[in-house]
Amino acid sequence: MPRSLKKGPFIEFKLEKRILDMNSKGEKKVVKTWSRSSMISPDFVGHTVAVHNGKTHVPVYVTENMVGHKLGEFAPTRLFRGHAGGKAEKGGSAPRKK
């Protein structure tokens, strides 16, 4: 269920303040954050935000297409290594007919 329009988007106060300060100074530094639920606003475009995925901080370069999405969408928390190989890779597992 989406957030009510009456409330407006959630952006962590400290994160928004850092981005606005960097915009006023014209700086481009990597900003670390644990706030995966913060919405990406148009002020974030062009900055790199390091979003925590539970283990490390994943650098996310914000583009115009990302505005309106949440930071956590771009830092996956699970690593998929593929399904088990087994007999299918070695050859046919069905017995041959004579």
Curated annotation (Swiss-Prot):
Which Gene Ontology MF annotations are present?
rRNA binding; structural constituent of ribosome
Show the Pfam families listed in the entry: Ribosomal_S19
Biological process according to GO: ribosomal small subunit assembly; translation
Q: Ribonucleoprotein among the record's keywords?
A: yes
Any one of the GO CC terms: cytoplasm
Which UniProt keywords are given for this protein, alphabetically ordered?
Answer: Ribonucleoprotein, Ribosomal protein, RNA-binding, rRNA-binding
Q: Which PANTHER family match?
A: RIBOSOMAL PROTEIN S19P FAMILY MEMBER (PTHR11880), SMALL RIBOSOMAL SUBUNIT PROTEIN US19M (PTHR11880:SF8)
Any idea what job this protein has? Protein S19 forms a complex with S13 that binds strongly to the 16S ribosomal RNA.
Q: Which family does it belong to?
A: Belongs to the universal ribosomal protein uS19 family.
> Could you identify this protein by its name?
Small ribosomal subunit protein uS19
Q: Which organism is it from?
A: Chlorobaculum tepidum (strain ATCC 49652 / DSM 12025 / NBRC 103806 / TLS)
